[in-house]
Structure formats: structure tokens, C-alpha cells
Curated annotation (Swiss-Prot):
Any one GO BP annotation for this protein: intron homing
Residues annotated as domain DOD-type homing endonuclease: 534-683
Protein name, entry field: Replicative DNA helicase DnaB
Taxonomy, superkingdom: Bacteria
Subunit structure: Homohexamer.
Every SF4 helicase domain range: 214-484, 646-915
Catalytic activity: Couples ATP hydrolysis with the unwinding of duplex DNA at the replication fork by translocating in the 5'-3' direction. This creates two antiparallel DNA single strands (ssDNA). The leading ssDNA polymer is the template for DNA polymerase III holoenzyme which synthesizes a continuous strand; ATP + H2O = ADP + phosphate + H(+)
Species of the source: Rhodothermus marinus
Xref: InterPro entries: DNA_heli_DnaB-like_N_sf, DNA_helicase_DnaB, DNA_helicase_DnaB-like_C, DNA_helicase_DnaB-like_N, DNA_helicase_N/primase_C, Hint_dom_C, Hint_dom_N, Hint_dom_sf
Annotated binding of ATP, by residue: 245-252
GO-annotated cellular components: cytosol; primosome complex
């Protein structure tokens, strides 16, 4: 890593060149200091209305009804004052979560995100509420602020134009920046307000009158395939149509059949084709070949054929057709949008075709975004383009390899289009109410909430799940971290790393994964303290098998007495506890008070059966699902009594004494449950496998280590029983006189280095100044090669004035290295769609979701013969047959349309239309024969 250059701090009054070069003035990275310095140089003050900003925020704080009115007009960027941007974002977050918005809640939200001081502190927030008496004029004030934003953006454009005179500036990079700014400006300008029903109905009736009388019930742009048009009504205006298939299935050939839209005598319209894969000449050759093949097969007059076998009359319809081909490689969304706008204005195009989606480039993606999110942004941009131009946009898309690995007939499905991975069916999804549910049991459920990581704040938040679904049978891999957290996923499923989201097949041992540092808990308990305590003892040292008396065993007399007391407190006179002292143990028998008739059971047995934990042997034990829906205090009570059974709390003596705090069990499920319950108390325990050799079953230890986690255990959980309380006191005495060595809960250098480097660059802080701010001797680059503890990261964030690092230091993320990635069989897999954050907590690991398709229509091309399938389910031959599967249609039915695929011409035809003349053999290749053609003025329909 190169060392930073020493740069002087910004001095507003200096005449010399500012320390921020204009090259840094890009749409997503410019700072308020940069803009202000540039304006000072130009001698102008940026357009602003700070007093009105204060009035709008004050109105939003005192009157909740002002919030939606302001949100329709303003974005955070509309506010000139950085304090106001932070306050506005806090209000928006509270509003989106349906939480109350007032001075107190906004203050607390800013304090939670560490932005309270940057937002002006509590005094400034209080002053905002006095700036306005009511919210009556909030909409008028908001429009003035929005107008100032437009003027400010126009002025930024003027500054960018000034860069054209800089000989060191890259012209193409400058062009991209200017184009991005123009579209940011137009995006603000084109935001629409709600329209009245009267206006909408009038436009709808005019549209219906215009299409009245069209043959075939086609209301949009025809595809040229009768059965397909019967299901879709043609490609509708404002729709995004995705045509997806594996390579060599005929995606481009199918899309080029849409040339019929340009050549149709009744529905003719301009077509724009953006080919990122093939050149314009290649497309023209395919169009000519397909067009010639569609003409009547007649003897060709002399001189009417070319050497390639394509008849000259085929040129006439295509040459005159309003088809526009652009073969720019790696086309960006902004550039595509600009070209489509121009073609719409100059030629009134009615259809846009993009070939293909995965070759496009998104603009201004977040630093930790992955390819799936980039494709999703491109898809959303294409949908926005379709609505803006009011034309259908047809985008081709490559399906994932999951189609090839799936068994059966390999028909494509929607999950193949999402470019996302999947999780094994037993993966436990943490719902927002605390429950952990296997993902397979969530299939077909909708609109439930999970915990997800906000990618901007790195905090866990509630997020709604729009869909849970099965994606087929696929190979899975078991991924295990150093803490022992484990998850089984397909090779293409993504997990969060310091470098962004990565697929399983891109990960390797040693890479850091994002895990939640804590899981929020419920606010109201549903179990009493006595029930929680009794459960802890019975799960740990209880015998609850059928046809056996409920029995508890302990070596401590005080614990035996406690369990007998708890049973009486919970079940009253229904049970009669009996304590029997044996040689080394105390047995507590929890018998029913009355003799049990046939069909009657001990009330404790019924209780445990209702909780789902009756009849389990030691290696099968688990924590009831209801425990995960309790408050943190209730969970602590349960763990305190569970630890009194098979838990260890003691000081290990020797040359280097250390505290040993762990829970031991032969049940892997119980160990995972205990680890997850500790996480709800903010304790990141390690699950360790301990082999027993010939002594017995493998044991699993849930180990609490590290000063911070041990102190949380002492303070939140504690101990029960004289023996463990004394041991816990010794542990606390040891911790109270020692400092911690936080080498586990760290911020990886790969995550924080670039953030601090950018902050230093923008604020003109040199290496020496940074070390001085930290109170350290200058050490060169040594600091920048280390992982940081959270405390040290906070100090560095203050020294470098880096709010992003402060967020990471106060985040809900624990970065844990991977220890193994192993194949783990082939089975049915599943996934979720979580709009917004696009992730969720699964097996106490943060996993990416499957992004919902923005398309209005999704078509799949399926040719069975490509997979060696020679006959269909009815015994009919599949040679030359293609299925067009409508996997999704927002405003119409789904279904399958069968078409003919003429391989020689790479052309699709209506299955009933294509009838070769008897005795006319099809050529093996187009180059081996001269194609006959009809009269030059004959239409192709």
C-alpha cells in the first residue's frame, strides 16, 4: 500500500489552489468542503435556504402529518446543511419503521447511530422545533428547498464544465461524470406527483379507443407469435420483458423475431437494438438470413441471389425498416438511457431490445455491492426507462448454471434468473419475533419479518420478507467459522466479507465473514421466572423419558432443594417432589400428586410435550423454540439455571491462571441453541467439538472467553448454587484487575484501511498529524497493517475524522474467520427475498437474499433436444421444437407456448405456420444453397 502524501488542511481564505483536486469531484464522492472551496474560488455562494430547511425539519418534528408531505418533494441531498441531512435521514428511518417521530425519538435515533453531535446535539434539535409554529406551509417551503437543489446541481455542472480546460483531465472520464450529473438533475426534475382518477381514466379511455378494432386482441407491440400474443396481448407499453435462457438456446434469434414489430403493416414501430455481444454486421447477417427464410419459396430469377445464399429482395423490407442497432460494448445504464431518449425524440421508437443484461454496467454502486445487486440495479433502471419512454423494453438474460446441475428435464424456473444461491432446508431463519424457523417451513409464506443488516449503518433492523421459495435440488457446502457457527449453502450463495458480498466458491479459509454481534430480543416475557428456572434444570440434568418418572439428579443439596421448590411453585399441588440422598448424588422425583389412570400423564410431562422437548435422550436435547421469544432477562434466567447443571465456572490455577466458563453437552443441537441464546445477550461464544475417544459420545463445549464477554456473563447471567456463585466471584476478581486483549472482536484492516485513507485525503490529514491526534509516536505505515479492536477503531475514527469507521466500530457485526468449507451432499434448497437490505440472519450468520425480479413479464426459452431429450412426456419427438415458458406475467396468465425452431436459419416460427414444400429438403447450412425469394414488394406477413 502506498503511503499517503502529506496535504495541507483546507484554508477557506487562501488564494492558492485548494488541497482537493478537481479530479475527485465525482457524483458519489464529493464533499461539502470541496464544493464550498470551489464556490469560494468562483466568488459565488451556493444556492441555499438554510432557514427554510430549519422550518421544514421543525414542522416534521412537531407535526407527524408534515412528514409524508415533505417526503414527496425532498431527499436528504436536497438539504444544504450537513446537519439537516442527518436529521432528515433519521426522521425517514423512523417513519419507514412506523415508529413515532418527535424530538425525543429523533434524538435517540441519532444517538444510536453516533450522529447526534454531527447533527448539532440536543440543543440544536430543540431550537428547530421553535422555528415554525405549524406545518401549514411545509409543502411550500419544501418546494423552495427543492428548487435550490436544482440550482445547486446546475452550478455543480458549471464547475464540471470548467474541468474541460484542465489538460490533465481524462476526457472520457469527464464525459461520464457530466452525464451522471445531468441524469441526477433530470431524476430530481422528473419526479411525478399523484394524479387524479379523472385524469387517469381519461387517458385510459383514449388508449382503449386507439387500440379498438385491432385484430387478434393485440393491445401492445406484437411479437409475431400468435399463441404468445394471445397470452400477453403483445409487449405492453411501460413493461420490462426479460427473455432468459442458457447459452445457445436462441435468445438473440427470438429477440430478432421482434423485427416483425418494425415491419408489421398495422403495428409498425421503430425498434432500437442494443447489442453488447454481437456486432452490428453480425446482427444484420442474421436478420437478412431470417428474413430471406420467411419469404415464399419460389425459383429465384437470375442475378437475384448473393454468394452467401441470401436473396437480394430480402434487403428491401429490412433496409427501409426503422430498426436502429447500437453495438457499443460494456454499455452503461446512463449511456443507454441517453441514447434511448434521443432515439425516442428523433425517431419515436416503440420498442427497445437489450442483448444482454449481464454485459451491462451499473452506475454508482455501493462499495460492498455484489454482482447480483448490480444486475438488480440494471433491471430497475431498465424498468424505469420503460416507464419513462412509455415503450416496452425487452432484455435478454443469461440463466445461472443451476439449470445444468438440476436433475429431471432441466426446465428453467424463476429462481434460475436471480443469480443468487440457496440454503439447505434445515437452515434456521431468525424471525423478528425471536423464533428460529427452518427455511423449508417458510415456503409460500409472505410478509413476515426477519432481522437484516442495514448496509448503510451496519445495524440490525427489522425487514419484511416478500417471498420464500424452493429452488430445486443442488449440491451444498458446509461453511464453518472460528466461533463454530455453521451454515450449508450452494456454491453461488453470497455472504458478507470486508471486500463485499462473495459467493461460497469465491471464499477460502481465513476469509472474514460478517456475523451478528447480538440478536435483539422481545420486550415482554411469556414464561414466568420459576418456569424458566425449572426448564433449565430439567433440560440439563433431568430425565424426561416416556414410561419413566420425571427425575432430576444433582450432586448439590441446595440445587436439589431448589428444583423441588420450583416444581411446587409452577405446578402447585399437582406434583409431590421427593428428594432422596444417595452415595454421591441427590435424586429429585417429581411424581404426580394423584395416581395416573390410563391416558393420564404427569402434568410436567404434558408441559414438556407442549414445549416440544419431552422424551429426548441426552444427545437429542434442545432448547424449546419458545425460549427464543423471551426477553433478555428471561433468557439470562434460563441460562443461569441451565449452567448449574452441566456448565463449568471456575478459575484454572497454574503459572498462568485463567477463567474457564463453558457449557458441555453431548447434544449438538443443544450446544447450538445455547450459543444462539448467548448471542441474544451480546455474548459471542465459541462452539467447540471435544472428542472422547473410547470414553463415550463426542462432547460439545460452548465456551465464553475474552474479558468483555466474560464480564457480560458475570453481570447478565451470573450463577445459581453456592458452589458456582463462589467460583463466579473468583472469576470476577480476576477480571477486575486485568485489562483485556481484544484479538477476536476486531475490524479487519481490509475493511477500514480505504475508509481512513479517503477521510485523511479529503480532510488534508497527513500520517504525522494522524499519529499526533492519536497521541502516538510516528510509526510510518505500521498502523495501517493491523486489524483494530473496537476501542482503537473509535479512537482512530476521531483522529481521522472518519464517520464510516465510527459506524463500523459501533456496528452490530462480528467479523469471524472461516475455518473450513466442505462439500456436504446434494439436497433440496431454498431462499428468501428481502426487499431493501437484501439480506437476513440465518444460522446466526448474515446471508444474502434472492432479489425479486423487477420485470413485468419473464419468458424462458427451453429446447429439450439441447439436453439430449428426444421425446416429450407424451412420446412426441422434440427435434426442432422450442417451448416459450411464461414464468411471470404481472397482468396476465402464465403458460407455455410451443414454437418451431429452424436451426439452419436460427429462426423461430409459429408451429402451425412453418410447412416446407413436399419434397424440398432443408439445406444443411445456409451457405450450401441459394434461397428462393418472393416478389420484392411482398410483405413478410
Amino acid at each position: 500500500m502506498a503511503e499517503f502524501e502529506e496535504r495541507p488542511r483546507l484554508s477557506i481564505g487562501e488564494e492558492e489552489a485548494p488541497p482537493y483536486p478537481l479530479e475527485k469531484l465525482t457524483g458519489g464522492r464529493r464533499t461539502r468542503a470541496q464544493i464550498h472551496a470551489l464556490h469560494q474560488q468562483a466568488g459565488r455562494v451556493p444556492p441555499q435556504a438554510v432557514e427554510l430547511e430549519q422550518a421544514v425539519l421543525g414542522a416534521m418534528l412537531i407535526e407527524p402529518e408534515a412528514i409524508p408531505r415533505a417526503l414527496e418533494i425532498l431527499t436528504p441531498e436536497a438539504f444544504y446543511d450537513g446537519r439537516h441531512q442527518r436529521i432528515f435521514r433519521a426522521i425517514v428511518r423512523l417513519f419507514e419503521q412506523n415508529r413515532g417521530v418527535d424530538l425525543l425519538t429523533v434524538t435517540e435515533e441519532l444517538r444510536r447511530t453516533g450522529e447526534l453531535e454531527q447533527a448539532g446535539d440536543t440543543i440544536y434539535l430543540s431550537e428547530l422545533t421553535t422555528r415554525v409554529a405549524s406545518a401549514a406551509n411545509v409543502e411550500y417551503h419544501a418546494r423552495i428547498i427543492a428548487e435550490k437543489l436544482l440550482r445547486r446541481m446546475i452550478e455543480v455542472m458549471t464547475l464540471l464544465v470548467g474541468r474541460a480546460y484542465d489538460p490533465a483531465a481524462d476526457a472520457f472520464e469527464l464525459l461520464d461524470e457530466v452525464e451522471a450529473e445531468i441524469f441526477r438533475l433530470s431524476d430530481v426534475h422528473l419526479r411525478k406527483a399523484a394524479r387524479s382518477m379523472n385524469e387517469v381514466v381519461k387517458e385510459t379511455l383514449e388508449r382503449l379507443e386507439a387500440i379498438h378494432g385491432r385484430p387478434g386482441g393485440i393491445t401492445g407491440v406484437p411479437s409475431g407469435f400468435h399463441q404468445l400474443d394471445a397470452l400477453t396481448g403483445g409487449w405492453q407499453r411501460g413493461d420490462l420483458i426479460i427473455i432468459a435462457a442458457r447459452p445457445s438456446m436462441g435468445k438473440t434469434a427470438f429477440a430478432l423475431s421482434c423485427r416483425n414489430a418494425a415491419l408489421h403493416p398495422h403495428y409498425g414501430t421503430g425498434v432500437a437494438i442494443f447489442s453488447l455481444e454481437m456486432g452490428a454486421e453480425q446482427l444484420a447477417q442474421r436478420l437478412l438470413t431470417a428474413e430471406a427464410a420467411s419469404m415464399p419459396r419460389r425459383p429465384a430469377p437470375d442475378g437475384c441471389a448473393t454468394r452467401t445464399g441470401v436473396s437480394w429482395p430480402a434487403r428491401r423490407p429490412l433496409s427501409d425498416a426503422p430498426i436502429f442497432i447500437d453495438d457499443t460494448p460494456s454499455l452503461g445504464v446512463l449511456e443507454l438511457r441517453a441514447k434511448c431518449r434521443r432515439l425516442k425524440a428523433e425517431h419515436d421508437i416503440g420498442l427497445v431490445i437489450v442483448d444482454y443484461l449481464q454485459l451491462m454496467q451499473a452506475s454508482h454502486m455501493p462499495r460492498n455491492a455484489n454482482r447480483e445487486q448490480e444486475i438488480a440495479q440494471i433491471s430497475r433502471s431498465l424498468k424505469a426507462l420503460a416507464k419513462e419512454l412509455n415503450v416496452p423494453v425487452v432484455a435478454l438474460s443469461q440463466l445461472s448454471r443451476a439449470v445444468e446441475t438440476r436433475g429431471g428435464d432441466k426446465r428453467p424456473q424463476l429462481s434460475d434468473l436471480r443469480e443468487s444461491g440457496c440454503l439447505a432446508g434445515d437452515t434456521l431463519i431468525t424471525l423478528a419475533d425471536g423464533r428460529r424457523v427452518p427455511i423449508r417451513e417458510l415456503v409460500s409464506q409472505q410478509n413476515f419479518s426477519v432481522w437484516a443488516l442495514n448496509p448503510q449503518t451496519y445495524r440490525l433492523e427489522r425487514a419484511r420478507v416478500s417471498r420464500a421459495f424452493c429452488t430445486g435440488i443442488k449440491p451444498v457446502y458446509r461453511l464453518t467459522t472460528r466461533l463454530g457457527r455453521s451454515i450449508r449453502a450452494t456454491a453461488n450463495h453470497r455472504f458478507l466479507t470486508p471486500q463485499g458480498w462473495k459467493r461460497v466458491d469465491e471464499l477460502q479459509p481465513g476469509d472474514y465473514l460478517a456475523l451478528p454481534r447480538r440478536i435483539p430480543t422481545a420486550s415482554t416475557p411469556t414464561l414466568t421466572e420459576a418456569e424458566l428456572a425449572l426448564l433449565g434444570h430439567l433440560i440439563g440434568d433431568g430425565c424426561t423419558l416416556p414410561h419413566h418418572v420425571i427425575q432430576y439428579t444433582s450432586r448439590d443439596a441446595d440445587l436439589a432443594t431448589l428444583v423441588a421448590h420450583l416444581a411446587t411453585k409452577v405446578f402447585g399441588s399437582k406434583v409431590t417432589p421427593q428428594i432422596r440422598k444417595e452415595l454421591r448424588w441427590y435424586q429429585v422425583y417429581l411424581r404426580a400428586a394423584r395416581p395416573l389412570a390410563p391416558g393420564k400423564r404427569n402434568p410436567i410431562s404434558d408441559w414438556l410435550r407442549d414445549l416440544g422437548i419431552f422424551g429426548l435422550r441426552s444427545y437429542e436435547k434442545k432448547v424449546p423454540a419458545l425460549l427464543f421469544c423471551q426477553t433478555s432477562e428471561a433468557i439470562a434466567t434460563f441460562l443461569r439455571h441451565l449452567w448449574a447443571t452441566d456448565g463449568c465456572i471456575q478459575m484454572r490455577r497454574g503459572k498462568k491462571p485463567y477463567p474457564a466458563v463453558y457449557y458441555a453437552t453431548s447434544s449438538y443441537q443443544l450446544a447450538r441453541d445455547v450459543q444462539s441464546l448467548l448471542l441474544r445477550l451480546g455474548i459471542n461464544a465459541r462452539l467447540k467439538t471435544v472428542a472422547q475417544g473410547e470414553k463415550g459420545r463426542v462432547q460439545y463445549h460452548v465456551k465464553v472467553s475474552g474479558r468483555e464477554d466474560l464480564l457480560r456473563f458475570v453481570e447478565k447471567i451470573g450463577a445459581v448454587g453456592a458452589r458456582q456463585r463462589a467460583a463466579l466471584a473468583s472469576v470476577y476478581d480476576y477480571l477486575s484487575v486485568r485489562t483485556g486483549n481484544p484479538n477476536r472482536d476486531i475490524i479487519p484492516v481490509a475493511l477500514w484501511y480505504e475508509l481512513v485513507r479517503e477521510a485523511m485525503y479529503q480532510r488534508g490529514i497527513s500520517h504525522r498529524q494522524l499519529h499526533a491526534n492519536l497521541g502516538m509516536a510516528y510509526g510510518g505505515m505500521t498502523l495501517f497493517r493491523q486489524n483494530l479492536s473496537r476501542a482503537r477503531a473509535l479512537r482512530l475514527a476521531e483522529a481521522a475524522a472518519c464517520p464510516e469507521l465510527r459506524q463500523l466500530a459501533q456496528s452490530d457485526v462480528y467479523w469471524d474467520p472461516i475455518v473450513s468449507i466442505e462439500p456436504d451432499g446434494v439436497e433440496e434448497v431454498f431462499d428468501l427475498t428481502v426487499p431493501g437490505p437484501h439480506n437476513f440472519v440465518a444460522n446466526d450468520i448474515i446471508a444474502h437474499n434472492s432479489i425479486e425480479q423487477d420485470a413485468d413479464v419473464v419468458l424462458f426459452i427451453y429446447r429439450p433436444e439441447r439436453y439430449g431429450i428426444t421425446v416429450d412426456e407424451n412420446g412426441n419427438p422434440t427435434e426442432g421444437i422450442a417451448e416459450i415458458i411464461i414464468g411471470k406475467q404481472r397482468n396476465g396468465p402464465t403458460g407455455t407456448v410451443r414454437l418451431a425452431f429452424i436451426n439452419q436459419y436460427a429462426r423461430f416460427e409459429n408451429l402451425t405456420m412453418y410447412q416446407p414444400e413436399p419434397g424440398t429438403p432443408l439445406p444443411e447450412t445456409p451457405d450450401e444453397t441459394i434461397l428462393p425469394s418472393g416478389p420484392p414488394d411482398e410483405a413478410p406477413f
